[in-house]
Regions:
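Structural marker of alpha-solenoid helical repeat scaffolds
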Residues: 15, 49, 83-87
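Canonical positions in the second alpha-helix
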Residues: 11-12, 45-46, 80
């Protein structure tokens, strides 16, 4: 029997539930399947275990945006910028700023005159 990657990550989490990297791997697979709600749940677990994991904030914002929660996406990216400031991850900070600015532009374009 061939196990799916989600099944593999889930089995790994049964053994190591506090491992942020495994949660991130699970979220990545959920993202690929466009399972936004489950991916968001997994990514929230990642950042609760490791609040400095900037890539998780980036993906969480993208997942929330894809799910139609632009305000939630923007907050995730702002939280990621704070994490990048704490850790000195300047490249991640630049990317998160770009995502935030892009979302702000999209949000403004959708507002009625």
């Amino acid at each position: 029997m061939v196990q799916s990657k989600i099944e593999i990550f889930t089995a790994m989490l049964a053994e190591q539930p506090e491992n942020a990297m495994i949660w991130y791997g699970l979220a990545s697979e959920q993202y690929k399947l466009e399972n936004w709600a489950e991916a968001a749940k997994s990514l929230r677990q990642v950042v609760s275990l490791n609040p400095d994991y900037t890539a998780a904030y980036q993906m969480l914002g993208t997942v929330l945006a894809n799910a139609g929660d632009l305000a939630g996406a923007q907050q995730a990216w702002r939280d990621g910028i704070e994490a990048a400031d704490r850790t000195g991850a300047w490249k991640a900070k630049q990317h998160l700023h770009a995502l935030l600015e892009s979302a702000a532009g999209a949000d403004e374009a959708l507002r009625p005159d």
